[in-house]
Each structure stands twice: as C-alpha cells, then as structure tokens.
A protein has these predicted regions:
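N-terminal loops that bind phosphate or other acidic moieties
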Residues: 2-62, 66-122
C-alpha cells in the first residue's frame, strides 16, 4: 500500500479534510493537499500537483469529484505514464481508512470506505 496520500479538490476542501482528519487521528505528515483555487487553471493545477509529488516515490490520490478539473488533470497524468492509484469522491472515512491501513501495514479496500460507510441517521 502507498505510504503517502495526495488530496486534490476544488477550493480548499482538501486542506480542510486534512485538518478535520487530524482532529481525529493527530498530525499527519504523509497527507498532501493540492487545492485548485478560483484564480488557477488546469495548467496551474498540474504544475502545483507535480511539484508536490516530484519527491514522492509511492503515493495514492483522492479527488473530490469525478469529472472535475482536479480529477481530470490527475487522470491525464496516468495516461501520460505516471503510476499511482486515483479515487474520486473522497470523504473522511476514505482518508481514515487509508491512514489505518498505513498504520497497520495492511491493504485497505478504498472503494469500501468510499461507498459503504454511509448510514441513515433517522
């Protein structure tokens, strides 16, 4: 399993997701948020993403929205030959599941955490 997690999103959602996760799990040095800000375009975002991952050997990427600019830019990198896993629809259970997998040294079913952790609170 990858040891580093890159969070990509529209706006600062990825930064706040990291902050919220740290409230539960404590400080995390292996999570790197890469926000697409309103003043930036796809090329700006690509450069920012590449500058974050250039020194990382092993990482996985969670994106906020399938079909959104952050996810599309990162998926194009996969088509260009970069090697990493990409999951869209990120949420806190996915991030916590990833961190638990790293801590325990075990594989985590990211899809399970992404879709099976919903419940009705009625």
């Amino acid at each position: 399993m990858a040891k580093n997690l890159i969070l990509v999103s529209h706006g600062t959602f990825c930064e706040e997701l990291k902050n919220s996760t740290e409230m539960i799990m404590g400080p995390q040095t292996n999570i790197y948020p890469v926000p697409l800000l309103p003043s930036e375009g796809a090329e700006d975002f690509k450069e920012k993403f590449l500058s974050v991952v250039e020194n990382l050997d092993d990482y996985i990427v969670f994106a906020d929205l399938l079909g959104g600019t952050p996810c599309n830019v990162v998926s194009r990198l996969l088509m260009e030959g970069y090697h990493f896993e990409l999951y869209a629809g990120m949420n806190m259970p996915m991030v916590i599941g990833f961190l638990n997998g790293v801590l325990l040294g075990s594989e985590v079913d990211i899809i399970h955490y992404g879709k099976e952790k919903y419940s009705s609170c009625e």
